[in-house]
Amino acid sequence: WVKQRCGQDTKIVLLGVSMGAVSVMNALKYTDDVDYVVEDCGFIRVSQGLPFVYRSMVHIPNPFLMPVVKKRAKKYGFDMLDNNPIDVVKNSKVPICVVHGDMDRAVSVECAKELGTVMKNPKSRVEIYEGRDHAYSICDKERYTRMLSDFLDEMFVFPVEQEEEHGK
C-alpha cells in the first residue's frame, strides 16, 4: 500500500515500542517491502510476552496462565512456539536497530542482547540505555533522537541532486 501510494522507491521504516516492537519484528515475516526496523524493548519469545501482558493488566503473577493459553491457542491452530520474533529476525536481512533499557523490569535486557547475536545485516545495532526501565529509553531524548538519526542517515543515501533538498 505504501509503495503504491508513495512510489516504488519509497523506503519503509517500522518503529515499535514494547508490543509494537514485537509487531514490527513479526512484520518482516509477511513482506519484503520493509527496509528498516527500529525495535524498542520488545520480547523475543511469546512465552516471555504473555506473562508480562497478563501482569500489566491484572497486576499479579499467574502460574497457570501459560498452560491455559497454550491449550486455547492450539485449539485454534496457533502454536506459540511458531510465533517468536527472534526466529523472524534470524531469517531477515533487514537492518534493525534494537533499543532497550538495562533496568527493564518487564522485558529483560537479555532479549536485546540475544537479538544482537542473530541479526544478519552488518548495519544492524543494539543500543542499551543505562538506568532505563521498560519503554523509558526515549526519556533520554537527545541520545534517542541522535541514535535514530544516525541509524537512518546511515541507511538513506540520497542521489547528489537530492542532497540540497534533504539538507545534506
Q: What are these regions, as identified by a protein language model?
A:
Residues G116-A135:
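Catalytic histidine neighborhood in serine/cysteine hydrolases
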Residues N26-F78:
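Hydrolase active-site cap/lid region
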Residues G16-G20:
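Gly/Ala-rich beta-loop-alpha elbow adjacent to hydrolase catalytic centers
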Residues M103-V107, H134-A135:
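Acidic catalytic loop of the alpha/beta-hydrolase fold
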Residues P85, V94, S108-T117:
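Short alpha-helix in the alpha/beta-hydrolase fold that links the catalytic acid
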Residues N91-K93, V98-H100, D104:
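Short beta-strand/loop motif that positions the catalytic acidic residue
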Residues W1-T10:
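Conserved acidic catalytic loop of the alpha/beta-hydrolase fold
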Residues R132-T145:
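Catalytic histidine-centered segment of alpha/beta-hydrolase-like enzymes
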